[in-house]
Each structure stands twice: as structure tokens, then as C-alpha cells.
Amino acid sequence: LGQGMKSVTRQIAAEALGVPIEDVYVDTADSDTGPHDMGSFASRGTHRMGNAVMRAAAEARAQMLEAAAEELEVNAGDLATDGRGNIHVKGAPSRSITVEETAQAAQFRQGRTLAGRGIFLVPMSDVDPETGEMTPVSCFAHAALVVDLTVDDETGEVEVTQINSAYEVGRALNPRLVEQQLIGGAWMGVSHALYAVSYTHLTLPTMLWV
């Protein structure tokens, strides 16, 4: 079912821009419409893509507030968003303009386009010349799993009866999606352990074959 990236990136963009999540549309780009990336392997989509979206939305928000400030004849720093698609003067909610009106004014009256770009890269870890150590990943999964199973003494068949998972996930932006990831990851582990091809049954050529 995937990592739910469209849902979580909509949440991030909506909160940053101060608009309802229903007003955010995520376009799944390909190499025709967007740059290349390395993918969101290992359930890292929220960490990587989420930070990029946050930066892009912050840049777009700054431009949006500048455009709204010009329309309301105030300083951009005096403006706030209400999360419902409105921009208003702090302390004076009646002096407001909608995000839609701001975008239209920016495009057709001010001659600017409201757009943000964001990129998130984790710095490469160099090997310490003295210790030989390095940081192989940017974040770790702090977790514990206990699996209850039964084994048939005669056939060796394994049956998993229960999986108990405990994770420290930090701040969950979407708890339902996190739960799905944990359940999916647990069953993926079971799949690897019980159903994937085992290298113990893989015949490799040796010197005896020569």
C-alpha cells in the first residue's frame, strides 16, 4: 500500500502554508516533470521528502506573505495565517485576505509567481582516519520485537502466532500511517525469514568444480 507519502506531504504543506489540507494537491512527478532522486527506500519518505516539502512550503509562504502584505499595506512580519486559507493582520483579524486572493493578486497585479523549492540532503559521512568509524545512516529505528511461534517437530513447519512490536517513533505526523508501516515492516520481516530464498540452499561453484 506504500508509505502514504501523498497524505503526509499534504499535511506538511498545508500546515506550513496555513491552508486546509483539502486545498493541497500532490502531483506525483516523474523525470519529465521533476528532478531525479534516489527514492524513499527503508521507510524514510517522511524524513527525506517531508523535510524537502517543508523547506519548499516555507519559501512559498514567505513569498505569499510578502504579496499579501503589499495588498494589505502592512509589513509581512505583521501577518499570520489561520489554517483555513486566510491571511490576517496580527491582532486585527478583520483586516484579511485569502490565500487564493493573494495568489491572484501576486500573479495578475504584482507580476510575480508564488512558488517554493526545497531539497533535503543528508551530509555524507567520512571515515574517521583515527578510529575508522563512520555514521552509516542518518537515523536509526529504536525498536524491539518479540515473535511467538510454533514449530512442527516432524515437518519443521513454522507458524507465527503473534508479533509484538514496540517502537520509539518520535513525533508521528500521521499515527495511522505509522501504524501501517510498523505492521507492514513486521510482516515483511516474517516474509524474509520464512518465505524468501535461503542462501543455504543456493549452490555456488567452488574450486572442486574446476
What spans do the regions from the language model cover?
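Single conserved hydrophobic/aromatic residue that forms the stacking wall/gate
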Residues: H201-V210
